[in-house]
Every structure is written in C-alpha cells, then in structure tokens.
Swiss-Prot record:
Membrane topology: Single-pass membrane protein
Species assigned in the record: Aspergillus flavus (strain ATCC 200026 / FGSC A1120 / IAM 13836 / NRRL 3357 / JCM 12722 / SRRC 167)
EC number(s) per entry: 1.14.14.154
Superkingdom per UniProt: Eukaryota
Residue numbers binding heme: C453
Additional remark text: Mutations of Ser-240 or Tyr-319 lead to the resistance to azoles, clinical drugs used to inhibit the activity and kill Aspergillus fumigatus cells during infections.
Gene transcribed to yield this protein: cyp51c
Protein name: Sterol 14-alpha demethylase
Glycosylated residues, chain numbering: N32, N332
Gene3D superfamilies assigned to the protein according to its UniProt record, in alphabetical order: Cytochrome P450
InterPro entries per record: CYP450_sterol_14alpha_dmase, Cyt_P450, Cyt_P450_CS, Cyt_P450_E_grp-IV, Cyt_P450_sf
Induction / repression: Over-expressed in azole-resistant clinical isolates. Expression decreases upon exposure to diazinon and increases upon exposure to benomyl.
Keywords, sorted A to Z: Endoplasmic reticulum, Glycoprotein, Heme, Iron, Membrane, Metal-binding, Monooxygenase, Oxidoreductase, Transmembrane, Transmembrane helix
Length: 513
C-alpha cells in the first residue's frame, strides 16, 4: 500500500472519529439531562485541554457565558466538571471526605517532589496531624520572630546581590524574587542550620525539584523524561541533606537544640498512635515546607514589584506611609527595624498585597476526585464518580459583580471594600486548629475548606516584610517604552509572570529613610 493511500485512510479515519465525537456530544445533550452541559470539542481525548491550558480564566469566562456556572470539559481524556461562583467554591472545597478526594488527584504530581508518606501521599487524618506538627513555626510568637529574619535576608540581598549593584539598574524581577523568597523561607521556616546550606548547589536542587510540577506530570509522573530524572535526583540529594542534619543531632545527643528550630521540633513529634515521626518523614516535611513557603511568595512578590513599577506613584505612597506611621529611631532619624506590630499601621502595604493576590493568584484551579455520585443542590445535575471536580476561586475575584472594574489593579479599592476572606460566623476546626472555612467569600487567595493553606499568615507576613523593606531602599519603574505588566505564564502548575520581566530600580539616597 502506497504512502498517499495510507495518508488518505488516516485522514478519513480522523474525520470519522471527529464525526462520531460530535454526534456523541449532540446525543449526550439531548438524552442526558442529569449531567452538566459538555463543552463542545472536535478532538476526543484532547477535548478543551489546549484552550484551558493556554488561558484558563479566558476559558472559564467564555464557558460561563455559554453554559452557566456548571459545565464539564474534557481534560486529556478526563471529564472535568467545573462549578464556578461562591456556591461552586462551597460545593467543591467544603465537600465531605467521603464524597471528594484531593489525594487521588494530586498525589501522582506531588509525591515525587515532596516525598512519600506526607501531604497527599497519606490519609487525610495523617495529614491533619502533620499540619499540627508544623504549626510550631506559624504561631504568633514565631511570626513575630520571623520579621527581623526576613528583613535581614532582604537587606543582605539588596546589599550583596549583583542584581542590585550600584545606585540604579535593571533587574529580571522574577529571578531576583525567586532568590529572595527562598532565602526568607529558609531563614524563617527552616532554621539557621538549613539556611546556611542554601548555597548554589541547593538552589540548583530546588530548581530541578521545582520542574517536577510541570502539568504533564499529572498524566506521566513517572515517565523517564529528562526533567523527571533531574527531579528524582534532586529529591534524593535534598532528602539526604536533611537526614544528615537529623543524624548528626541524634549522634550528638542534641535532639533539642538550645534554639529550637523546625527540625528540632519535628524530632520531638509523635503521632496519636504513639509512633515517633520517622526521620524520612521529617525530611519530606522539611522539603514540603521549603517549597510551599517559597512558591506562592515568589510569584506574588514578583507581581507586586511589577505592579509597583507600572505605577511608581504607589511606591512613593508606600514609602510615605512608613515615614508617617513608623518609628524613626535609626541612625540620623531613619526608620527603625521592622516589627510585627508595625504592619497594623501600614494599611496600604496590606492592600497592595491583597489586591495583587486578587488579580494574580498563583493557582487557578483546585481539583477534587468524585468518590460518590454528587447531586448538585438546586439543579437536576448529579456528578458521577468518573469525573474530577474543578473549583476556580479566582473567577469570582476577577468578576465585576464582586469587584467593580475588576481587571484594574487598584490597592485603594480595599479602603472601602472590606476583605471577605474571613467570616467569624463561618469558623470550623478540621483537626489542626480553628479557622474560617472561607468558602462563601468571592476572595479566596489561599483556598478554602479543609485544604485551605495553613501558611497564609506567614505568606502575608513574608510578603509584607519584603515589600516594606524593598520600598525603604529602592524606587521602581518600568523600562522606557513599556506600560502595564507582562502576561501570565500558565505553563507551570504555579502560574507567574512571563519571563524575563525586567524593571528599572533606583536606590534611595538615605539607606533607611
């Protein structure tokens, strides 16, 4: 058989498959009234994957116009049911454990990165205990102690990094913020011993491990691809670094160092069944803490600096807010070192962070596997167990319905619009401390329900100290001829600005005010 004939048959087969697929979709809509509408697509298996992957929010808003808040699309062969709006957030993110499951969705992606027997590679009851263990580093006293550590890391970086050599220059801000935030997360959440190991080798390991979060690993987490080989080697090396620290302490009889850090805390922890936390799990929790503490902060701090560079007047407003509200007891009347209590007097700093989180949440989709058929209240729909549920809290955050002129970055909007992420009447305890479910709010930058980010207070504090410190020392502006901010890069699980994203910086004449 000649190649032209083979090509003709292949084309006919492809057309026939598409025709059958379109016919199936037509019959599905006509005959199956208990399923949400299926987003039209030409190619089976691929479905809407490309549109969703390139521009998830554009995809969500487009589908909402056609199908309403509830619809199903095909994501690499997997029926994925989206439920938008505050009711959708409540339905998915506050679903019962017996009905929805995060572990089955995320474990294939996260386990090779974080390690076994932690986070999504263990029963939810065990994860809750692990969250209790790490609250040591997230207590009020710990947060207060983190402030000078974070401030010092930022000041040291601005003083010594080649990115900020001299009195002015240009910088690829996502690259710089990635370095700053790994240092701040390491210093505050990991302790002095680990921070001292954040060398060039560790940075390379972190980068290789981070590449494990590429979206293809949802489908092929164990494929022998180059980035997966680097991921596995980086995980093994990083785990050995933590294990060496633990063994060194045990051999020296120093299980409880004079200055208790997170590793020392975890070495004392015991599960409810009486089992001490194994060293392997300590290492894996430490890896998780480092990556979780750095990821969102890196992306959001980059967006903050890009937004400030696009509106230099706001940079000066922030600086003047510090001069007007903080003590000036430093040398020559300069601003004093930052303290935790200072941020109660810096509302614009908080609003800049809040507004940037609203527009630039680093995770656009939150997924849950359906475990039991789920009736959707107020609709004829029943979601079958073959589906994955998808919540997109960022959709309400980007909707004019809740935030007038929603696509504009305006920190001052929060002066008249109360933050709705915490409702005192919506408090629940999932086993690791009382917190707001948050599912009824249109603003959920850290998720909601039992999987709401436990480290959001640290994230806010980390960002606030970074922003306040950088504003004290630097002015920012866009490069000549540039306006606005870069587009969003959705190629990774954690979205961020398209790289490189360069801005201009200028050092202030007085170092601290």
């Amino acid at each position: 058989m000649s190649w032209p004939r083979i090509g003709a048959y292949a084309l006919l087969a492809f057309v026939a498959i598409m025709a059958l697929n379109v016919t199936y979709q037509f019959l599905f809509r006509m005959l199956n009234k208990t399923r949400p509408p299926l987003v039209f697509h030409w190619i089976p298996f691929i479905g809407s994957t490309i549109h969703y992957g390139m521009d998830p929010y554009g995809f969500f808003f487009s589908c909402r116009e056609k199908y309403g808040d509830i619809f199903t699309f095909i994501l690499l062969g997997r029926p994925t049911t989206v439920y938008l709006g505050t009711q959708g957030n409540e339905f998915i993110l506050n679903g019962k454990l017996k009905d929805v499951n995060a572990e089955e969705v995320y474990s294939p992606l996260t386990t090779p990165v974080f390690g076994s027997d932690v986070v999504y590679d263990c029963p939810n009851s065990k994860l809750i205990e692990q969250k209790k263990f790490i609250k040591f580093g997230l207590s009020q006293a710990a947060l207060e102690a983190h402030v000078p550590l974070i401030e010092k890391e930022v000041e040291d970086y601005l003083a010594m990094s080649p990115n900020f050599h001299g009195t002015s220059g240009e910088v690829d801000i996502p690259a710089a913020m990635a370095e700053i935030t790994i240092f701040t997360a390491g210093s505050a959440l990991q302790g002095e011993e680990v921070r001292s190991k954040l060398t060039t080798e560790f940075a390379v390991l972190y980068h290789d491990l981070d590449k494990g979060f590429t979206p293809i690993n949802f489908m092929l987490p164990w494929a022998p691809l180059p980035h997966n080989k680097k991921r596995d080697a980086a995980h093994a090396r990083m785990r050995s670094i933590y294990i060496d620290i633990i063994n060194k302490r045990r051999n020296a009889g120093d299980n409880v160092p004079e200055k208790l850090d997170m590793i020392g805390n975890l070495m004392q922890c015991t599960y409810k069944n009486g089992q001490p936390l194994p060293d392997k799990e300590i290492a894996h929790i430490m890896i998780t803490l480092l990556m979780a503490g750095q990821h969102s902060s890196s992306s959001i701090s980059s967006w903050i600096m890009l937004r400030l560079a696009s509106q230099p007047a706001v940079v000066e407003e922030l600086y003047q807010e510090q001069l007007a509200n903080l003590e000036r007891t430093g040398p020559n009347g300069s601003l004093a070192p930052l303290q935790y209590k200072d941020f109660d007097n810096l509302p614009l700093h908080q609003n800049v962070i809040r507004e940037t989180l609203r527009l630039h949440s680093s995770i656009h989709s939150l997924l849950r596997k359906v475990k039991n058929p789920l009736p959707v209240p107020g609709t004829p729909y029943v979601i079958p167990t073959s589906h994955v549920l998808l919540a997109a809290p960022g959709v309400t955050a980007l909707s004019d319905e809740y935030f007038p002129n929603a696509m504009a970055w305006d920190p001052h909007r929060w002066e008249t619009q109360a933050p709705q992420e915490n409702n005192k009447d919506d408090i629940v305890d999932y086993g690791y401390g009382a917190m707001s479910k948050g599912t009824s709010s249109p603003y959920l930058p850290f998720g909601a329900g039992r999987h709401r980010c436990i480290g959001e207070k640290f994230a806010y504090l980390n960002l606030a100290v970074i922003v306040a410190t950088m504003v004290r020392h630097l002015r920012f502006s866009n490069l000549d001829g540039q306006t606005g901010v870069p587009d969003t890069d959705y190629s990774s699980l954690f979205s961020g600005p398209m790289k490189p994203a360069r801005i201009r910086w200028e050092r202030r004449a007085a170092k601290s005010g």
